[in-house]
């Protein structure tokens, strides 16, 4: 099992608050790794440090052995051709139709619309969207369809890795399962590496590895298939939703007042 991303002692400070406080994590190539943790724990900040949207205070991120934390913006842009990012909300431009939203990167780089069209059609097919959606606007699409359009847009650059930030936020359980299955199928079919931030424990069915972020550090890293059997106190408490344990929660503090 080879490592495609290595995170080494990654720290990030905003003002007087430390968000990540020495994260160490190896992301295995060709697998789905899910990162879980309390709300406000800094999972999205961690992901954005991985792709250079936020620069770490200290530490490093290695992509295929290259320390991307030290690269210039131009060098980062070159590396990011290999990495796709799916935002928590689809982040589609309301003024653009599906074709334009999916193909925007190619169109902005000077490709002709007639050359972009077959590429967009192919990516829409991969996420199970028909050509009928090509010229529809985000307001005409369901929440699940917008998520899939966002994924198709990520696929346009043929990434090796896709980072997902809460991909099923705002979706009902049925649609969320459809998105999870799609993510899994895409990973296997295209031989992708997936890193997923999620609060939806159903994702464990499709994941290979699970990492738990707590107090700015990785408190657990292990196999998703055996996670319910783990006796790690942090993961035991978190996946069962227990208010008491090593993870400090607002609920526990509230109970202490009575």
Over which residues does each language-model region extend?
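Conserved catalytic motifs of ABC-family nucleotide-binding domains
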Residues: 158
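Helix-to-loop junction immediately C-terminal to a conserved catalytic motif
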Residues: 51
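Conserved ABC ATPase "signature" region
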Residues: 66-67, 114-132
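Conserved ABC transporter NBD signature motif
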Residues: 59-67
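Catalytic Walker B motif of ABC-type/P-loop ATPase nucleotide-binding domains
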Residues: 162-165
């Amino acid at each position: 099992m080879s490592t495609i991303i290595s995170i080494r002692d990654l720290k990030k400070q905003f003002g007087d608050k430390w968000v990540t406080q020495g994260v160490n994590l190896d992301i295995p190539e060709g697998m789905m790794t899910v990162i879980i943790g309390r709300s406000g724990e800094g999972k999205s900040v961690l992901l954005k440090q991985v792709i250079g949207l936020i620069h770490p205070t200290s530490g490093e991120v290695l992509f295929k052995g290259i320390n991307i934390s030290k690269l210039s913006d131009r060098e980062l842009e070159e590396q990011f051709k290999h990495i796709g990012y799916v935002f928590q909300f689809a982040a589609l431009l309301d003024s653009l139709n599906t074709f334009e939203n999916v193909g925007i990167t190619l169109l902005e780089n000077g490709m002709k619309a007639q050359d972009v069209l077959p590429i967009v059609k192919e990516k829409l097919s991969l996420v199970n969207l028909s050509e009928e959606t090509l010229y529809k606007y985000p307001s005409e699409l369901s929440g699940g369809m917008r998520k899939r359009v966002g994924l198709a847009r990520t696929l346009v650059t043929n990434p090796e890795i896709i980072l997902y930030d809460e991909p099923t936020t705002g979706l009902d359980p049925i649609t969320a399962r459809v998105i999870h299955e799609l993510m899994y199928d895409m990973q296997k079919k295209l031989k992708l590496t997936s890193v997923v931030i999620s609060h939806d424990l159903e994702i464990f069915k499709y994941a290979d590895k699970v990492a738990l972020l707590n107090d700015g550090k990785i408190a657990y890293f292990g196999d998703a298939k055996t996670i319910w059997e783990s006796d790690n106190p942090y993961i035991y408490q978190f996946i069962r939703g227990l208010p008491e344990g090593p993870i400090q929660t607002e609920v526990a503090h509230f109970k202490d007042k009575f």
